[in-house]
């Protein structure tokens, strides 16, 4: 009798699953770019309104993401152009998956800068696309000549550019991204998962550049648990994407919460500003520590390089602080760690451990 595993695709059998770290109680969780607090914390009237709306949400009915008013709320909050179409996803991860599926013709290639978000490469493998990774410069800036040469040589059907980049936090220049879009015949996805922490966006160009899709999420601005992502671009492309998205891919409670949050976006914006201020404070303090290199960040995290990433990771963990160890993920990330910007107290705890280790 054949093993059940013999019916599973060999390439999937060879893959490794993405591992979510278990976090012990009482730990400062600074490994996944989440908000350090509930986004409505300190706003009791909004908390009451939220609970009332959740209590009346029609959880006995299938959701209608396109008809619940969330798209209109997104357009209003983020000034999405009228000429652009919007597709909603169960997190931007789902949209990355289906955009990859959309373009995965036999022999098609995907291009992305590396180190970058690992789900780009994962989905290329899952859907049989040839993956072309273009290494960044040593300071994590974009090697534009190499990108343009790869575009010319491989003619990718799909290119992902994270703006700002994950896991480095470095933001490529707008001119570089515009050059990559102009050089590409295929679809270029500008992934702005961390765009709220950056001073620039390609959202105003959505719907105006035929091969551009702008990808965003609510996860990094306090709502990681909702799994709300959205893609916006020309109706001709987004309309094709909507054909393959599952019809009920979001839930009533997430849709209700997201719509309410966007109606009170001033509160969310204040939370973002607070994290940006903490990021700048952290970067300045890290810059005072010898034997450590902190890379400039336009995201809600800072990536650092230290003499021994394992030692710092373990020392932080002993002090009940969990960060992301990047060492070993890519040659350019040797002895690097990524630290999510947390509360002032959490950030001070991180700084205290690092100062004691490298004093």
Swiss-Prot record:
Main EC class the enzyme belongs to: transferase
GO MF term list: histidinol-phosphate transaminase activity; pyridoxal phosphate binding
E.C. code: 2.6.1.9
Keyword presence, Mitochondrion: no
Reaction catalyzed: L-histidinol phosphate + 2-oxoglutarate = 3-(imidazol-4-yl)-2-oxopropyl phosphate + L-glutamate
Protein's UniProt keywords contain Translocase: no
SUPFAM superfamilies (UniProt xref): PLP-dependent transferases
Pfam families: Aminotran_1_2 (PF00155)
Necessary cofactors: pyridoxal 5'-phosphate
GO biological process, one term: L-histidine biosynthetic process
Pathway per the UniProt entry: Amino-acid biosynthesis; L-histidine biosynthesis; L-histidine from 5-phospho-alpha-D-ribose 1-diphosphate: step 7/9
Disulfide bonds: none
Modified residues (N6-(pyridoxal phosphate)lysine): 220
UniProt family annotation: Belongs to the class-II pyridoxal-phosphate-dependent aminotransferase family. Histidinol-phosphate aminotransferase subfamily.
Annotated PANTHER family: HISTIDINOL-PHOSPHATE AMINOTRANSFERASE, HISTIDINOL-PHOSPHATE AMINOTRANSFERASE-RELATED
Subunit structure: Homodimer.
Protein name per the record: Histidinol-phosphate aminotransferase
Organism: Neisseria gonorrhoeae (strain ATCC 700825 / FA 1090)
Lineage: Bacteria, Pseudomonadati, Pseudomonadota, Betaproteobacteria, Neisseriales
């Amino acid at each position: 009798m054949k093993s059940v595993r013999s019916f599973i695709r060999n390439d999937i059998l060879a893959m490794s699953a993405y591992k979510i770290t278990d976090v012990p109680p009482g730990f400062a969780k600074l490994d996944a770019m989440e908000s350090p607090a509930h986004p409505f914390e300190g706003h009791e009237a909004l908390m009451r309104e939220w609970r009332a709306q959740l209590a009346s949400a029609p959880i006995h009915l299938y959701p209608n993401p396109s008809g619940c008013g969330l798209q209109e709320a997104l357009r209003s909050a983020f000034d999405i152009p009228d000429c652009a179409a919007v597709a909603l996803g169960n997190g931007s991860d789902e949209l990355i998956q289906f955009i990859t599926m959309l373009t995965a013709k036999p022999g098609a290639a995907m291009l992305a800068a590396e180190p970058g978000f690992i789900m780009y490469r994962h989905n290329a493998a899952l859907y049989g696309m040839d993956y072309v990774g273009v290494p960044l410069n040593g300071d994590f800036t974009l090697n534009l000549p190499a990108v343009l040469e790869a575009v010319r040589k491989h003619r990718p059907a799909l290119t992902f550019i994270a703006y700002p980049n994950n896991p480095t936090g470095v933001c490529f220049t707008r001119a570089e991204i515009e050059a990559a879009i102009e050089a590409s015949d295929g679809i270029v996805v500008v992934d702005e998962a961390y765009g709220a922490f950056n001073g620039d966006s390609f959202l105003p160009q959505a719907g105006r550049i035929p091969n551009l899709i702008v990808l965003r999420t609510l996860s990094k601005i306090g709502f990681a648990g909702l799994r709300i992502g959205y893609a916006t671009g020309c109706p001709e492309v987004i309309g094709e994407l909507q054909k393959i998205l599952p019809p009920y891919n979001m839930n009533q409670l997430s849709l209700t919460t997201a719509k309410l949050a966007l109606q009170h976006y001033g509160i969310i914006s204040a939370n973002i500003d607070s994290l940006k201020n903490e990021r700048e404070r952290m970067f300045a303090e890290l810059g005072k520590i010898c034997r450590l290199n902190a890379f400039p960040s336009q995201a809600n995290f800072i990536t650092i390089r230290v003499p021994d990433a394992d030692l710092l990771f373990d020392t932080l963990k002993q002090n009940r602080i969990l960060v992301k160890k990047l060492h070993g993920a890519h040659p350019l990330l040797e002895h690097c760690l990524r630290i999510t910007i947390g509360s002032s107290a959490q950030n001070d705890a991180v700084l205290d451990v690092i100062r004691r280790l490298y004093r």
